């Protein structure tokens, strides 16, 4: 269990270091990713107003209805495409990618690749 808590503490330290440098504005909001053991979440956030402009997760009805039990990297890529499409509907094409302390590998990388495929630039 000690290993698990040190992993969490290390991720939170990385998150603080990243968050000092990354902020989202109205013209270039922040694409924030959260990864749990079972699901992945993505939000496009304007930090100036503190509002979420677009969001998607593996718990969305639209994702569950259209996808046949996608898991892992495939689900993350689909969520990246979904959040990218929702951001483009709102007129957002440029974002700042916030990996939220998670390593840029696996599902986090797959989500960013899916968002780039949808047309987001970062």
Curated annotation (Swiss-Prot):
It comes from the Bacteria. InterPro entries: Ribosomal_uL18_bac-type, Ribosomal_uL18_bac/euk. The keyword NAD does not apply. GO terms for molecular function: 5S rRNA binding; structural constituent of ribosome. GO terms for cellular component: cytosolic large ribosomal subunit. One of its GO terms (biological process) is translation. The keyword Ribonucleoprotein applies. Gene3D superfamilies: 3.30.420.100. Keywords: Ribonucleoprotein, Ribosomal protein, RNA-binding, rRNA-binding. Belongs to the universal ribosomal protein uL18 family. Part of the 50S ribosomal subunit; part of the 5S rRNA/L5/L18/L25 subcomplex. Contacts the 5S and 23S rRNAs. This is one of the proteins that bind and probably mediate the attachment of the 5S RNA into the large ribosomal subunit, where it forms part of the central protuberance. HAMAP family: Ribosomal_uL18_B. This is Large ribosomal subunit protein uL18. It comes from Desulforapulum autotrophicum (strain ATCC 43914 / DSM 3382 / VKM B-1955 / HRM2). The lineage of its organism: Bacteria, Pseudomonadati, Thermodesulfobacteriota, Desulfobacteria, Desulfobacterales. The gene is rplR.
